[in-house]
Amino acid sequence: MKIRDAYTIVTCPGRNFVTLKIVTESGTHGIGDATLNGREMAVAAYLDEHVVPALIGRDAGRIEDTWQYLYRGAYWRRGPVTMTAIAAVDMALWDIKAKAAGMPLYQLLGGKSRERVMTYAHCTGQTIEDCLGEVARHVELGYRAVRVQSGVPGIETTYGVAKTPGERYEPADSSLPAEHVWSTEKYLNHAPKLFAAVRERFGDDLHVLHDVHHRLTPIEAARLGKAVEPYHLFWLEDCVPAENQESLRLIREHTTTPLAIGEVFNSIHDCRELIQNQWIDYIRMPLTHGGGITAMRRVADLASLYHVRTGFHGPTDLSPVCLGAAIHFDTWVPNFGIQEHMPHTDETDAVFPHDYRFEDGHFLAGESPGHGVDIDEELAAKYPYERASLPVNRLEDGTLWHW
């Protein structure tokens, strides 16, 4: 099962996606997601210049060996660009192997650990009342879990909140980074009020999640975690910048609120101490940025030893290829927690036809061989790349801060 061809496809059906397609001599093909939000062309260039030439002629069935070749052989290890490129190759090779075996990916991984995959929706609003309306709408759609974000009084732009009701939230909206103003004090005073309102309106049975998006210092995060304990959050996500793993120890010592982190991680070494010391409850590193299925199996296996569960990052800046592969992984992995779900646009779904489906607050993996997602290259070509950048944050005094 030699690799005959490999190439990248860059398309923008509403937002940019990078896809790697690998074709074997028998004609079987697999695809992998190589999207890195705001740095898409860096990964595409890495693949085109350094990875694709090395794939031609290799045995597509030797997934582990290829992963090690791309990781160890590069010398410059880890980092988001390298690991996203490796993940795309890995995802495509698992797709090919499952197709060759004639089985859906979850079967090749070891079979089902569950019948369906619980997801959480994003519920936002400029005001708490607007957010509550979105929660009600998603509960009607069958969701048992929601991530809630609302505008903070006195802050013009708040992370995760669309500019107008019903609009999709898309932070990468200009060719150069937009600058937003952030106030930790105003946020900390406001956030508990949001959770109190959700619990008062919807009771205790609904799973409630919240994303801080790396904005706080460790002691500020500890204060927030303690303050929201009465509202029994499913998790508090990315409450501090991810580089300082020791900060999670301090937060853990101050609060029983479950902690989730990892969407900007790229390697098992980014989360090893967090898992082994049980400073977190959920690991969120996505397949696309964490080195693919091969690497994330190792992360999940390690996490299972310490009662840490998966909660994969799943926004619309990762393509349906990543989501499809993640749903198969979620269906198999024993220590599954939850899967993020932000619906893609109709244009994106048309470019990436898939057989996974959403039903009553859950995803169901498809039964076709592989991960069940393909790409319509002719349609993809109609949506050329459009440069876009994520915003940056400044404090009210002008100091650059974490976005």
Curated annotation (Swiss-Prot):
Task: Name the site position(s) for Important for activity and substrate specificity.
Answer: 315
Give me the reactions it catalyses. Answer: D-mannonate = 2-dehydro-3-deoxy-D-gluconate + H2O; D-gluconate = 2-dehydro-3-deoxy-D-gluconate + H2O
Q: Which parts of the sequence bind substrate?
A: 37, 122, 263, 284, 313, 317, 340
Q: Which residues form a coiled coil?
A: none
Report the transmembrane regions from the record: none
Residue numbers annotated as active site: 159 (proton donor/acceptor), 213 (proton donor/acceptor)
Q: Which GO terms describe its molecular function?
A: gluconate dehydratase activity; magnesium ion binding; mannonate dehydratase activity
Pfam families, A to Z: MR_MLE_C, MR_MLE_N
Cofactor(s) this protein requires:
Mg(2+)
This chain belongs to the protein called D-galactonate dehydratase family member ManD
Organism of origin: Chromohalobacter salexigens (strain ATCC BAA-138 / DSM 3043 / CIP 106854 / NCIMB 13768 / 1H11)
